[in-house]
Amino acid sequence: MWFRNLLVYRLTQDLQLDADSLEKALGEKPARPCASQELTTYGFTAPFGKGPDAPLVHVSQDFFLISARKEERILPGSVVRDALKEKVDEIEAQQMRKVYKKERDQLKDEIVQTLLPRAFIRRSSTFAAIAPSLGLILVDSASAKKAEDLLSTLREALGSLPVRPLSVKVAPTATLTDWVKTQEAAGDFHVLDECELRDTHEDGGVVRCKRQDLTSEEIQLHLTAGKLVTQLSLAWSDKLSFVLDDKLAVKRLRFEDLLQEQAEKDGGEDALGQLDASFTLMMLTFAEFLPALFEALGGEEIPQGV
């Protein structure tokens, strides 16, 4: 269980939460299949294991792992449009009259309801870790929309969830640009070989560099011309590598082999033990990594009144 992406949310109040109360709350919003006329469903499912008795909360030390599943029927717009056009053409030809918007919308709704039971179903899961001792919720996603879907459903289950996206005092683009300009990152962070540069003008250009020497004259000329670094690949403390963007999304997380080997050793032969060991080691690593990252980016911004 290693997160591949990371969106960080700050709890703005102490969250009085234990495994039993969280398990009970999530049980009120379980994942379930789409009914024949439903476009989508969303709810919580067991992060590890299957079956009705699998717990919805996995606990390790004082960290909680949860998982939400979205199920949606895929009904391509082109299929609906073609069916609607065929129906409208048929009515206009047979009844010698024009079909106007109100009737067209009604026909579209009828077509959707007819096609829905035969539509393909797509399922996707999103994991999140709740760390009350750190005051953080960590979502394994690079999509803010997916993270907000999980958090809003968690808020409904708990009744309230005082949380906001984490922010820092200095604009991330300014810090990332400075690191590439000076060819040195702060603390135990190291600049790797990938970045995205954007012009500050609205219609300005974008340069994406992969497997390139970011200390090269070519890159420095782009920075001198006014481009800002909006994504940068970094390594931290010989433990993990990642890409950080200007929205503080951590993408393409990769934990170094030493950590993964340690998790395999700690987990033993049992599959659940392996998952638990990797989750625990990941969270203990995040407990060191995230404060170091916030500090390197100029410190966490705490909005007034929070």
Curated annotation (Swiss-Prot):
GO MF annotation: an example: double-stranded DNA binding
Keyword annotations: Cytoplasm, DNA recombination
Keyword Cytoplasm: yes
Pfam families: RdgC
Superkingdom, taxonomy of origin: Bacteria
Keyword Cytoplasm carried by entry: yes
Cellular localisation: Cytoplasm, Nucleoid
GO biological process: DNA recombination; regulation of DNA recombination
Major place of residence: cytoplasm
Annotated GO CC locations: bacterial nucleoid; cytoplasm
Function: May be involved in recombination.
Alphabetical list of PANTHER family matching this protein: RECOMBINATION-ASSOCIATED PROTEIN RDGC
Family: Belongs to the RdgC family.
Name the record gives this protein: Recombination-associated protein RdgC
Upper classification of the organism: Bacteria, Pseudomonadati, Pseudomonadota, Gammaproteobacteria, Pseudomonadales
Encoding gene, per UniProt annotation: rdgC
